[in-house]
Amino acid sequence: MQGDVVKALLEALGADVVTLPEQFGSRQVVDWSGLPGKTPRALIRPRNTDEVATAMRICNEYRQPVVTQGGLTGLVGGANVLDAELALSLDRMNHIVEIDRISGTMTVEAGTPLQVVQEAALDADLYFPLDLGARGSCTIGGNLATNAGGNRVIKYGMMRDQVLGVEAVLASGEVVGALHKMIKNNSGYDLRNLLIGSEGTLGVITSAVLRLRPRPRAVATAWCALPSYSAVTKLLEEAQAGLAAGVSAFEVMWAGYYDAVLANLPELRAPVAERYPFYVLLESVGGDPVRHAQAFEEFLGRMLEAEIVSDAALAVSESDALAFWAIRDAPGEYPKFIPDHAAFDVSFSISNVGDVAQRCDVRLRERWPQALVMIYGHLGDGNIHIVVDVPGAGKTLHGEIDDVIYDVTREFHGSVSAEHGIGTKKKAYLEFTRSDADVAAMRAVKAALDPNGILNPGKIF
């Protein structure tokens, strides 16, 4: 029966929307994970929600599996096509529908790139706080499907905290949700939050109402060098008290990460002269630029005087701040010097992060003394990234490295996925984080909304 589905889609939507492999040729059809994917039987590129609904209704009738794709910047294979599947790309649905300055909202289609949203908000003298390294390529739909986190969760929360309304198409072709602008809405089950983070397994998100914030009038950024992990956590504690709600980023980097990226990426420059065990990129936002800058400098002075911070560099220009952020955003350059690395996105209670990092480092080096181990992350929300490369091993050891990291994650009752999702890459380790009852409940929701199992099958569980 599936053999006729492409014909039915072509008849309903036309060749401009439905294309065959020989027509889309070398177009990217896999994400950044490096995991294998298949060429889709056809690529559907709808222009609006009605065309998404038509496509899903036909696919459901034919029991045809469909994978929704955004910017394909995911790192867990969540958007990769498996056997005999169709791909549904939302890249044409990339319009900003409305900016409502009074409500502080932006209504956008799911294929809109994150950076476009950020820039449009600034043009309206507002601010959309979600930010991550793939900002130029990732899309709002993908950010929603994975409940993206990024660099400023410490102040603004995850992607679900930036959304007021969501519109989506179910497997049946029915359109659900509402593009409302209400902060308070307790009218039954929250379908919005059910769809956010579902990795395209429950519905195709087509549009959203995003919550905008007042544009910060002042941004202060500093690069801090610290003598110990206890000093890092003390700096976090002091920053949250001394800078109040202003702390918008607290990015910690262990020395192994800092040394490796500076040694291999000559375009980066060291913010401080000496080498230290830990580094923190601290950012704070506020209202009055003069007062905020003064308060930030005074805070840094107190931290240096108390020897919590050993050395610091204050960004005196936007280019200085961008240079600091370039060091933190260096993971995008890994293919240049560690193309076969294994990467992990895990989260823990903030109080456990230091012990987790130490235990992972010790166990990895016991197994592979020559391994490059890089640890960094968003300490303010307990999310760290661990990158491991064993010289000469290629990707042959990835399974064993996975076991080491996820065993430690289970020991500390952490999450195997802080912000990247599960996809196919982490399926085997979902039980390390979620109970059998949790997974059974998720399967029940999946069966209710997608009884034929056509939406992104083989992902999550």
Task: Give, region by region, the residue ranges found by the protein language model.
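FAD-binding subdomain of flavoenzyme oxidoreductases
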Residues: 95-249, 455
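N-terminal flexible segment immediately upstream of the FAD-binding catalytic core
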Residues: 1-57, 74-104, 257-269, 318-345, ...
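N-terminal accessory segments
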Residues: 1-32, 61-64, 303-319, 411-416, ...
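Short, ordered loop/turn segments at secondary-structure junctions
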Residues: 70-73, 133, 255, 421-422
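C-terminal substrate-recognition/cap domain of FAD-linked oxidoreductases
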Residues: 20-28, 214, 220-228, 233-404, ...
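Short, hydrophobic/aliphatic alpha-helical segments
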Residues: 52-66, 121-138, 175-195, 365-366, ...
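Activity-critical C-terminal alpha-helical subdomain
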Residues: 174, 427-461
